[in-house]
Amino acid sequence: MTRVLFAAAEAAPFYKTGGLGDVSMALPRALQAEGIETRVVIPYYPHQMPTEYQQQLVPVTHFTVQVGEHAMYCGIKTLTVAHVQYYLIDNLDYFGREGLYGYWDDGARFAFFQMAVCEMMEQIDYIPDILQLNDWHTAFIPVLLAEKYYWIEAYRDIKTVLTIHNLQFQGVYDPIILDSLFRIGTETYTEAGVAFYDQVNWLKGGINFADAVNTVSPTYAQEIQTPAFGERLDGVLRANRYKLSGILNGIDMQLYDPATDLALTANYSAKDLKPKRQNKRALQRRLGLPVKNMPVLAVVSRLTKQKGIDLLLDALNPFLQQQDVQLIVLGTGDPALERALRTYQSAYPQKVVAAIQFDTQLAQQIYAASDIFLMPSAFEPCGLSQMMAMHYGTLPIVHAVGGLRDTVIPYNRYTGQGTGFSFDDYQPAVLRKIMILAVTLYRQHPLVWRQLQHQAMTCDFGWEHSAQQYRATYQKLMR
């Protein structure tokens, strides 16, 4: 049986800040279901971990990890959830904080984590066939295996797979860290290694040293090889394209199922969509909007420019003046964008609700209650929200990039095919035009709309497909 150790900086259900947390929960479970023994290693953030899981933790061992001149305590705890065994790396100095990221010493924190992962394998006698790494927090591990731990015989056959969930975050530090944190020489500090504009780039090191690299959608894998999306690593990615692929993320089809979702006022399915309207009325009442059967548009997102919130704001004013619609926005993020959304709520109190908060239950109610889901991201490695919206029969409007292009089939008025709407030209007027098209179709052609809902709801976005592609990647490396 293939053995995989899945290393990440976060994992639901313990803690998550975004899509990485969802993937770190769902993909290991899906790999297990495919017959691949998969264990997960993450940091132990005691302040974030729910008590029910804290109480299940069992100590395994402890040792010290040399971070520069400092011998740092490293405790290993374990628990099993949904048939997946998790190892948690414990060091209060580094991980006993209120948040997960964004600290001045993140370099030291995740240098420690990566060395702890490498040393833990021998300490607990779990030597995987595949080390599945995720984003910059674990991207330097292939470099460490080649330069620091090369003498450990048991590690020689380990293959490394690096998954890039978002190329924007790379782990870029002063070259001094090679010695001051990792205690390795400067042999890798070259263009073909880890050097990046007079800095050390962990993600670049991972791309160059890993046995395989993938991103979380086929389109994003192509896009990041261009200057427009490559975040200054497009040349490195083109040089490594022989080992680069795109594997689409999935969603938990059981968890996000309108037929069984306990957060909803009324459950419904692709066969019986009528109760969906009850969810709309309940949400309108809850949020203080007029209870009317009008088109409800929704955003559930981090409020950032990457997610296209600035584009949406620029498109909104004429749209709201001319159209009898309601808009519900749920999320937190850039304070300037939060303020702008609140301003719209003040200007259009009968039409706009800006819920500046993080609330998963409310999010699921919004997916169920709304008619149109807005996701005009500037770039989108994969995106999960558009898949959730479709599964709830809420048709997405997306910018045709990355995973949005791979998951949403644009409506074709001639054939009736489609699961949503998309636009290419990233302009407020273009977004506004497609919003008007969607709202008009909803109002004037209810039978066409219902057919699109049915097509969206019956798409299979389950993790099984993704897990099979990861399995194929692993098998290819192990030949």
Curated annotation (Swiss-Prot):
ADP-alpha-D-glucose binds at K16. Keywords: Glycogen biosynthesis, Glycosyltransferase, Transferase. Pfam families: Glyco_transf_5, Glycos_transf_1. It is an enzyme of class 2 (transferase). This is Glycogen synthase. InterPro entries: Glyco_trans_1, GS/SS, Starch_synth_cat_dom. Gene3D superfamilies: Glycogen Phosphorylase B. It catalyses: [(1->4)-alpha-D-glucosyl](n) + ADP-alpha-D-glucose = [(1->4)-alpha-D-glucosyl](n+1) + ADP + H(+). GO terms for biological process: glycogen biosynthetic process. It comes from the Bacteria. Its EC number is 2.4.1.21. Synthesizes alpha-1,4-glucan chains using ADP-glucose. GO terms for molecular function: alpha-1,4-glucan glucosyltransferase (ADP-glucose donor) activity; alpha-1,4-glucan glucosyltransferase (UDP-glucose donor) activity. The keyword Glycosyltransferase applies.
